[in-house]
Amino acid sequence: MWATKSRRCAVHTSSMASGDVLPRFFTVFLSHCSSESMVIPRSYYNLLPRPLPKTAILIGTGGRFWKVAMTSKQEQVYFEQGWGNFVADNQLKEGEFLTFVFDGHKSYEVSIYGRGDCKETRAVIQVEEISDDTEDDNVSLHSPSNVSLDSLSNDSHHSTSNVSLRSLSNDSLHGDAEIESDSEYSPENLPSASISVESVEVVNPTTSRQRSYKRKTIENPHLYLDDPNNVCFETCLKLRKFELLVHAQLVKDYGLIFSDNVDYIDGYGKLTAKTTKWADQRVCINKWQKICERNQFTENDSILCEILRNEDKVVYAIKIHIFRDAAAST
């Protein structure tokens, strides 16, 4: 239902029973009452988790995130400490509309609509350039059976090159590619906190392993996760969109166990998809094309996939974090 509030806030309480739509609300930014804190519409309170979390994560249209305090006082719930930073970084103006899509945990994807009634991208995340310092950081593919079309971009040409393997951009791969086989991988040679394999960057902040294969990566990706201790990997829009690849090396390094079906979790809700496990331990998850289409991914977007595991350490879901125009900003 829609309920207009005295502070020009409104809320749309979309049911999650179908699993297709996440709850959301919208508000109008008024500087005199929303510059340092923002009240959440009362009509939305029954959808807030209980007990009320102390903090929430706001994810902007440009891929950045803000941690804000959630407080309850005088029977109202507010975004407080940290909200002022969100306002300043996104340069919010009087009368602009903001929509908040809740993921059911603690994150809200926030969209901003300017005076022209169009969704705007603001506070774009900066993507750092990382060069490979040693020959060990170059990877080559020795067997065609290890090549996935997932690693091919839309603008690929017909020549041979080495693949740098953090999230692939459209001009980073040309034709036939080379990547190191799993048998050549030596964990003890990896110096710090992430492992990058085939078209993905793999990150686990709790380990001390890192390998840099791709020149571009999202800076500090674990900061954007629901749980910074979760394993995650980075990918992008590719020609082969019908399945999402979880590389064998990632599965081996973190002992990932996949159930026969997992859920994608994005701003539209949950989508259950079938997993296919290969002999070399790589895992493919179908219905990825639907995720790409309903989120309208472009070649300039980067996608951070957060792996969610249950108490038995079995993977049950992939949480999608979208970084709009991240590649274009480099």
UniProtKB/Swiss-Prot annotation:
Instruction: Tell me what this protein is called.
Output: B3 domain-containing protein REM21
Question: Which organism does this sequence originate in?
Answer: Arabidopsis thaliana (Mouse-ear cress)
Assigned keywords, A-Z: DNA-binding, Nucleus, Transcription, Transcription regulation
Q: What is its main location?
A: nucleus
Q: Which InterPro entries would you find in this protein's record? A: B3_DNA-bd (IPR003340), DNA-bd_pseudobarrel_sf (IPR015300), Plant_B3_domain (IPR050655)
Lineage top rank: taxon: Eukaryota
Q: Name one GO molecular function term.
A: DNA binding
Q: Please list where the region (Disordered) is annotated.
A: 129-169
DNA-binding residues: 23-116
